[in-house]
A protein has these predicted regions:
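Substrate-binding/active-site clefts of carbohydrate-active enzymes
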Residues: 1-80, 84, 106, 112
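Active-site groove signature of glycoside hydrolases
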Residues: 8, 73-100, 183, 187
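The substrate-binding groove and active-site-proximal loops of carbohydrate-active enzymes
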Residues: 57-71, 88-97, 151-156, 189-198
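Glycan-recognition and catalytic regions of carbohydrate-active enzymes
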Residues: 220, 228-229, 235-299, 306
């Protein structure tokens, strides 16, 4: 997947330099959103509304993707990436600030070459207008990631709150979109998961939820070792390769690998069908949901976010666990298991 930034450009982008040199006489003048000329040369042009930029930084002028010449320039580049380098996917940065016309023409141009190419948009809010089949295949699912993290950050939230926010995320879009949403818990633009999580147990619990949800789970580099980091740029620390090679994070990496392996090899974890049985409703901080397939098999996920032991009868096949001992799910415990409807009925008797 290549990252395409078509919302804005850098200061040394040749067309922008041509505009700075020639002003309105530049053939590229209309490539940008310039409201007034000449521009303030003290770095305050965008704050004076003389031109539109990304983040009010004068060195990142916004591109006018309503301009046919701009659209052709960047779409031709994308076509070249697909034809020459056979890329599998493209991510559009700040996608909600790129024109719909650009997104539609990009979709048509590269899907003609490779119908299976994955077009991903970086949009932080509800993105239904971009997900009607003629622009993006998916967006970065920040609402889901925030819903998961919020449950661990705000201890006053209950399993009913969790159920509501998860269901809200998955009723916002059509099923075929939910199947391919780009699910994440942290990125280069957010605090890292381990920094938000109070401890490693909370970190693993949130990953267990991530790998159980419909869509395409993604982990940010460093998340596999529980790397910490605050807001940008702290979230973009270098990987501690020396410590990794010395085995310092071996156990963490193995646990994350186990979850990834489980996601890949357990079809039910990829299922779009899930529900919340509420068998543990008396424990407001215990999450329980089940992934359901076509047959009678079910994968059940139970996570004890409370401060007390929870009795969870043994049944089925354990796929992944932390702090599950003798039918007791300890505080911060995780249980992922495969059960059948028959075994569930026997257990409920």
């Amino acid at each position: 997947m290549l990252d395409g930034v078509f919302n804005h450009c850098g200061y040394y982008f040749v067309p922008w330099q041509d505009v700075l040199e020639k002003g309105p006489q530049s053939e590229y003048f209309d490539w940008f959103m310039i409201n007034e000329w000449p521009l303030d040369k003290r770095g305050k042009a965008s704050k004076k509304k003389q031109l539109y930029t990304f983040g009010f930084f004068d060195w990142m002028p916004k591109l006018n993707t309503n301009n046919p010449a701009v659209r052709k320039f960047f779409i031709d580049i994308c076509v070249g990436w697909v034809e020459k380098y056979k890329i599998d996917a493209i991510r559009l940065d700040v996608a909600n600030e790129v024109s719909h016309r650009f997104c539609k023409e990009l979709h048509t141009s590269i899907k003609e070459i490779n119908p299976d190419i994955y077009i991903l948009g970086e949009i932080w809010h509800n993105a239904l207008p971009w997900l009607r089949g003629d622009e993006f295949d998916a967006v970065m699912n920040y609402p889901l990631g925030q819903s998961i993290k919020d449950f661990w950050i705000d201890k006053s939230l209950t399993n009913e709150d969790f159920e509501y926010t998860i269901n809200r995320c998955y009723t916002s879009y059509m099923q075929q979109t939910n199947d391919v949403l780009f699910n994440l818990l942290d990125s280069h633009d957010t605090k890292r998961l381990r920094t938000d999580a109070k401890n490693l147990d909370e970190y693993f619990a949130q990953l267990a939820v991530l790998f159980s949800m419909p869509g395409s789970p993604c982990i940010y580099y460093g998340t596999e070792i529980a790397m910490e980091g605050g807001h940008d740029p702290d979230c973009r620390r270098c990987m501690p390769w020396g410590e990794i090679e010395a085995g310092k994070y071996k156990e963490r990496i193995q646990k994350v690998s186990d979850l990834i392996h489980l996601r890949i090899n357990e079809p039910l974890l990829k299922s779009r069908n899930f529900h919340f049985p509420n068998d543990y409703a008396q424990y407001p901080r215990v999450i329980q949901f089940q992934k359901v397939g076509w047959l009678d098999n079910v994968v059940e996920i139970i996570i004890n976010c409370s401060e007390e032991d929870v009795d969870v009868p043994m049944k089925g096949e354990i796929l992944f666990e932390r702090h599950y001992i003798d039918s007791t799910l300890l505080p911060n415990g995780i249980l992922m298991r495969r059960i059948s409807e028959e075994s569930k009925k026997e257990s409920d008797k």
